[in-house]
UniProtKB/Swiss-Prot annotation:
Residues 5-280 form the CN hydrolase domain. It is an enzyme of class 3 (hydrolase). Its EC number is 3.5.5.1. One of its GO terms (molecular function) is nitrilase activity. The keyword Hydrolase applies. Nitrilase that hydrolyzes preferentially 4-cyanopyridine. Is also able to hydrolyze some aliphatic nitriles, such as phenylacetonitrile. PROSITE patterns: CN_HYDROLASE, NITRIL_CHT_1. This is Nitrilase. The lineage of its organism: Eukaryota, Fungi, Dikarya, Ascomycota, Saccharomycotina. It comes from Meyerozyma guilliermondii (strain ATCC 6260 / CBS 566 / DSM 6381 / JCM 1539 / NBRC 10279 / NRRL Y-324) (Yeast).
Amino acid sequence: MGAKVKVAVVQAEPVWFNLQETVKRVNELIESAYNKGAELIAFPEVFVPGYPTWIWTNAADLDRNLMYTKNSLTYDSPEFISIIETVKKYPIHVVLGFSEKDQGSLYISQCIIDNTGEIVLKRRKFKPTHVERVIWGDTADSNMKSVVTLNFKEAGPVEVGCLSCWEHMQPLLYYNSAAQHEKIHIGSWPALNDKDLGVYCFTKAGFHGLARAYANQVQSFYLFTSILGQRIQEALPDVKLSPYFEKGAGCGAVFAPDGSQITEDHPDDFDGVIISELDMDKILLQKNLVDIVGHYARPDMVSLSHNRPNTEFVNRK
């Protein structure tokens, strides 16, 4: 048995589209995870302030889109500062998924806050999916960094990274994470429905299939965190939701580097954190079999190229 890392995967409901109340929920979940002995907590995609599910039936709802913009999070806001203060009070590494407001634009963002309260990684979703592009923009950052090194009590320094939702459909993105020697991966997902409505990749089994494949191919632990959507219709009483987003089921889970699920399934209405202990030797065992950025690679034949275009709005020469 190797060194252990105890983690907390959030399967919880936000206070839908209410920035201040959802940040309070974030702080409560951080405290809960810390009190359960976790050293890292992983939050779903845009947990703050919740996923705007109406875009899948009425993306041109300008009033709601404005409301959503006003309830999105900025790094310099009192709400974000309160999260930092909570981390300092309850020292735990945090991977936060949120709708980021930057001036007049929104982005699907993730950040990693270490257990001292320092922001050690900021990233934005590479490309919003389908109708998400009505609300959120592409990242304009040419920096492909998605992994940082965090320190844990028993395991010492460990590479931790994150991606959002269908970024896990992008093989080059997870190869990029593998090339940064990621050991613990956080996959942040929105409210998901466990019904099979004819599109398998929109089911729990389909989403978990992506997670299993990622864990196996990158040889990392995969923390699957998704928003609980039991009360989403109550928050949008006059909206006809897409059947894919009605009463979203909790899909929280942890997958080992061989793709096996190491947490039990929780009820659809379980609201809280799922605790799991990771045995870091499992990574070494899997790497011994296959290492796609090591002994099982041929960079002399196949490699990933990363373009670094200019992303400045004004260039002064």
